[in-house]
């Protein structure tokens, strides 16, 4: 019988900067699923990679003083780059694609031409709004408060000659796919796609650009570069040899369509609407599932490289082990929902589950076997009534685990395993091996208790392999498990270990962590890491710019105590609520933000020295407090005029900053008393 196949992918990540814990979360989940299917005996193909073209990369490379290719090479292949991170995290991908690979470039040109010749791509002119970070075009009606509906950042006016894909042609078929099949998971994502994007009317999609050069040229019209939709999405097929000779045709025939694409929920629209429509145009089979997982939140907000509010997976994996981090990511957060990340949660999970439960069970079992039998269990063993509950749980574990894994419910699958581990620890207390050891008459009973513990541990370890592969090999070594005891089939059979098993007392696989001490050290390490990164990325400012920044910072942030003023003097200050309508960084300064605010009567410009603490996109649409009757202040040698001051406060001795935000319901122009 032919071996069953399973093809799973991560998104291909955009290498504008080092990857963070959110990217690691998705990749670890994909790796766990791939390992699970291999454990079941499937022929698995696991693809990951990087999406390396686009205007943002071109701009980042220019800022860094290197070519775009050099820039992405460093992020992907350089020290602590993408590939190094996946090696550290023990990611078992079968194939890694870079969209700058020659075979992919050639294939994309063929795909673009085929869709053009079919009439599904045509030349026109794009006029509308464009979000550079998302590389997305939007109509006026799709904007939210004048900003990109995906990321909330400001958009710019764009007009250029472009090729378009007839997305509107496939609207009905895509709608039917989403509504009437389980193509998009979890199903809670379907209504958002249908009601927000399809039902209002799908417009044809811009699929080429002329305003930048870092991309794949359209071979029959080389002033155009192929836009991200075709370039990036078709990686899932070109990596299998589709329309190229890099890999054998049999790879595509064997593995396509994909069984599941794991993606972050922010790119569900691309994968559930644009991707199937393009495959329909190419008369290609559709993926079986697209699963849009939730975000890892930090302090209640989405992690973002551009915002700088990210967690470094290197620091955590090197400090606690890749397996501990892998386990935490998939144990603490339901895969389809958002979850709040914190170092405290990580350390508590390591202590509770890995040190107290799993590690303790292994060390107690092997230590007692060593102490009472020299590590060699006797073959004479007596069953007891206390055994039934544990054995029943252990024998039924694989079926419960399988049901959860097939639903991509990793949190539940791990909870099932650790419920049995918890039962095994309680079984030790119930059977009291130290009492049984006092009499030769109860030694056979003691041997059976230790065998039950070792065999329960073996079954649990088989099922933990997709999540903690290195740790599981250490446990197997201490339990002296042969290859046939590590298989999927063996997890359903209690009694695979020989009755006279030899157990080895080994290292403590997860030492307990001093939480208070560790959290303090982590905080210091992360602060030092962040400061070093900021210093490395901050070029020297011109003196005139620094002077302007210093003035803005001292006026808005320092707030030194001055001499007292009278009540009448204070009443002269006009304090009002204003809505931030636009905000951008300034080319002339790394510290100043240029805000356009509406004060209830007119828009005004305010320059504020808060760029170190706030990303522009985090302020747009917010209601803030301003000093509205401050005399206009020329800045940057008169190039700009700042027409007010925002409310900001020092938050710590290092010069942290917070801003007073007002509820959305507060009208712009409201007086502050």
Question: What are the residue ranges of the model-derived segments?
Answer:
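Intrinsic disorder at enzyme termini
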Residues: 475-569
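N-terminal Rossmann-like or analogous alpha/beta NTP/dinucleotide-binding catalytic cores
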Residues: 2-121, 135
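Structured secondary-structure scaffolds
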Residues: 1-48, 103-107, 151, 157-371, ...
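Phosphate-backbone binding interfaces of nucleic-acid-interacting proteins
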Residues: 542-673
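Helix-rich, typically C-terminal accessory recognition domains appended to large enzymatic cores
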Residues: 123, 129, 332, 337, ...
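Short secondary-structure capping/junction motifs at helix and strand boundaries
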Residues: 89-96, 116-129, 141-142, 156-158, ...
């Amino acid at each position: 019988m032919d071996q069953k196949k399973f093809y799973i992918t991560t998104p291909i990540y955009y290498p504008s900067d080092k990857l963070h814990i959110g990217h690691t979360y998705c990749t670890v989940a994909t790796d766990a699923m791939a390992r699970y299917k291999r454990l079941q005996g499937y022929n698995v193909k696991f693809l990951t990679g990087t999406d390396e073209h686009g205007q943002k990369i071109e701009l980042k490379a220019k800022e860094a003083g290197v070519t775009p290719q050099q820039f992405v090479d460093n992020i992907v292949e350089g020290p602590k780059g993408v590939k190094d991170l996946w090696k550290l995290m023990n990611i078992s991908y079968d194939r890694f694609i870079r969209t700058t690979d020659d075979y992919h470039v050639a294939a994309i040109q063929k795909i673009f031409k085929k869709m053009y010749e079919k009439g599904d791509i045509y030349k026109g002119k794009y006029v509308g709004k464009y979000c550079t970070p998302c590389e997305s075009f939007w109509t006026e009606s799709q904007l939210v408060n004048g900003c990109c509906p995906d990321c909330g950042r400001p958009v710019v006016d764009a007009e250029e000659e472009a090729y378009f894909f007839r997305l509107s042609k496939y609207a009905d078929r895509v709608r039917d796919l989403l509504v009437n099949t389980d193509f998009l998971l979890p199903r809670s994502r379907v209504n958002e796609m249908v009601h927000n994007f399809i039902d209002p009317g799908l417009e044809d999609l811009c699929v080429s650009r002329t305003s930048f050069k870092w991309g794949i040229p359209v071979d029959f019209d080389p002033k155009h570069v192929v836009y991200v939709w075709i370039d990036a999405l078709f990686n899932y097929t070109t990596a299998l040899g589709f329309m190229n000779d890099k890999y054998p045709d049999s790879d595509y025939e064997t593995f396509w369509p994909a069984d599941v694409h794991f993606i972050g929920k922010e790119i569900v629209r691309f994968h559930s609407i644009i991707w199937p429509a393009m495959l329909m145009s190419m008369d290609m089979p559709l993926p079986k599932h697209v699963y849009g997982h939730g975000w890892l939140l930090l302090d209640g907000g989405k992690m973002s490289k551009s915002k700088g509010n990210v967690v470094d997976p290197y620091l955590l994996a090197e400090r606690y082990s890749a397996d501990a981090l892998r386990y935490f990511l998939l144990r603490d957060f339901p895969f389809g929902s958002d979850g709040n990340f914190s170092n405290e949660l990580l350390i508590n999970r390591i202590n509770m589950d890995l040190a107290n439960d799993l590690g303790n069970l292994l060390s107690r079992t092997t230590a007692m076997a060593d102490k009472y039998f020299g590590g060699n269990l006797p073959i004479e063993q007596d069953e007891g009534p206390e055994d039934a509950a544990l054995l029943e749980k252990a024998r039924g574990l694989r079926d419960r685990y399988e049901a959860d894994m097939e639903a991509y419910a990793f949190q539940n699958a791990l909870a099932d395993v650790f419920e049995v581990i918890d039962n095994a620890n309680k079984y030790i207390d119930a059977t009291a091996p130290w009492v049984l050891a006092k009499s030769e008459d109860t030694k056979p009973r003691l041997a059976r208790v230790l065998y039950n513990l070792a065999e329960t541990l073996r079954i649990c370890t088989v099922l933990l392999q997709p999540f903690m592969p290195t740790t599981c090999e250490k446990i197997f070594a201490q339990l002296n498990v042969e290859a046939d005891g590590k298989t999927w089939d063996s997890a359903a059979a209690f009694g695979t270990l020989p009755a006279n098993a030899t157990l080895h007392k080994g290292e403590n696989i997860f030492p307990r962590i001093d939480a208070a001490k560790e959290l303090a050290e982590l905080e210091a390490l992360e602060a030092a890491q962040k400061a070093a990164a900021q210093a490395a990325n901050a070029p020297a400012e011109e003196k005139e710019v620094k002077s302007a920044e210093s003035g803005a910072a001292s006026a808005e942030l320092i707030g030194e105590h001055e001499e007292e003023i009278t009540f009448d003097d204070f009443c002269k200050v006009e304090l009002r609520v204003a809505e931030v309508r636009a905000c951008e960084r300034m080319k002339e300064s790394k510290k100043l933000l240029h805000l356009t605010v509406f004060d209830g009567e007119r828009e005004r410009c305010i320059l504020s020295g808060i760029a170190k603490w706030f990303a522009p996109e985090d302020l747009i649409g917010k209601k803030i407090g301003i000093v509205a009757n401050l005399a206009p202040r020329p800045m940057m040698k008169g190039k700009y005029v700042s027409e007010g001051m925002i409310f900001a406060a020092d938050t710590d001795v290092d010069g942290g900053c917070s801003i007073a935000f007002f509820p959305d319901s507060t009208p712009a122009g409201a007086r502050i008393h």
